[in-house]
């Protein structure tokens, strides 16, 4: 998609992405990854962190996500998708967005995802590793970001 390519290039991220398809790109941030795409008239950045909410610890987990949302101050927020995935995401209208703004949005999602995935795994997923996104991806080559 030309608009996304142009934004990534002007934001200095073009050499750090792996194209998933015409509408989606992936970037790696430490142990987390961010999927970026244009959906309709919006640009979204999503870091899929967990396949499911931790069994037996739901109330404490939800509280922790809300606390993390408050800490991030609106830069990004946790959500639970209809398929059960726990994601960290941010988005805004495409109109008027420039590459630097996109890079800032992606970096916010990436850095917070990299910070919080390890904390949440340690607190909630040590006995449920199958619910994390920490699978063997040795066959996938994804450029590192700062």
What are these regions (language model features)?
Residues 120-146:
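Short, highly charged C-terminal tails/helix-capping segments
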Residues 46-89:
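Short, internal acidic amphipathic alpha-helical interface segments
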Residues 62-71, 92-125:
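Ampiphathic alpha-helical segments that act as solvent-exposed interaction surfaces
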Residues 27-33, 80-106:
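Amphipathic, soluble alpha/beta structural segments
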Residues 1-33, 71-73, 79-81, 146:
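Charge-rich, low-complexity N-terminal segments
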Residues 26-52:
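Short N-terminal mixed-charge amphipathic segments
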Residues 37, 55-57, 98:
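Short acidic, gly/pro-rich beta-turn/loop elements at beta-sheet edges
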């Amino acid at each position: 998609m030309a608009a996304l390519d142009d934004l990534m290039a002007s934001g200095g991220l073009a050499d750090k992405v792996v194209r998933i398809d015409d509408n989606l790109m992936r970037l790696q941030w430490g142990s987390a990854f961010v999927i970026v795409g244009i959906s309709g008239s919006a640009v979204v950045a999503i870091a899929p962190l967990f396949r499911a909410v931790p069994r037996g610890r739901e109330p404490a987990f939800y509280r922790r996500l809300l606390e993390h949302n408050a800490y991030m101050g609106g830069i990004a927020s946790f959500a639970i998708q209809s398929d059960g995935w726990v994601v960290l995401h941010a988005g805004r209208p495409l109109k008027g967005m420039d590459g630097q703004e996109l890079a800032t949005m992606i970096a916010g999602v990436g850095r917070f995802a990299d910070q919080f995935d390890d904390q949440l795994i340690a607190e909630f997923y040590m006995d449920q590793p199958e619910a994390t996104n920490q699978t063997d991806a040795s066959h996938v080559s994804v450029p590192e970001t700062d």
